[in-house]
Amino acid sequence: LHSTSRRQRQMCIRDSSTSRWAEALRELSGRLEEMPAEEGFPAYLASKLSAFYERAGMMQNLNGTEGSVSIIGAVSPQGGDFSEPVTQNTKRFVRCFWGLDKALAYARHFPAIHWLTSYSEYLEDLTPWYRDHVSPKFVADRNQLMAILNQESSLMEIVKLIGSDVLPDDQKLTLEIARVIRLGFLQQNAFHQEDTCVPMEKQFEMMEIILYLYEKSKALINRGMPVSVLKEDNIFERIISIKYDVPNNQLDKFEQYRK
């Protein structure tokens, strides 16, 4: 790691399974007849995990250069139980968590990272970078999309009980826009030339178009137009397809969707 940072490189290390390592640590601890802690894991599990993750970060080298090491650790708790010791201690020492969701994987929604269980504590640190390198509105747009997804989660509890037909049109619109966010923005096709790697500028333009559709649709609903009429010209499906239809090097085409 140190030789990599001295050569002024940015390196990422992926740990395939912290859980298996912790289980091996538990077995060795048992054979050494050490005092077990929660669920049989050794009492020093937390310190071992912290010693590993604390090796990540930016390096100020003696030769005046800079390098960095990023660590991504995979935790596989038994039965998806996030309360077990390995998961809990890992979350103590990291500031970002990607929660993989089995239902999303079965639905072929990749990456199968659930947007409500996942989080990043780096958002505040990165806000100046987004403001200077992408747009001052980037974080605000991101927060608005997350608010819509949270509203969808609350509304889905009602939909499961009594169906979506009984919802008022403004709430139906929220569900429709959330679907656009999930399929048109979050879902990714790694085998598609335009979608396999999307620049930040395009991601921002996609968020802007989705929110533009939301505001214009909400204005029409406030004037009495039902959501069913808005859906007749497949405008929502067209917005879902912009990730494929707009090339990564032709972002000026987004203006066509504002007309």
Regions found by a protein language model. Give the residues of each.
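Walker B catalytic acidic pair
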Residues: 17
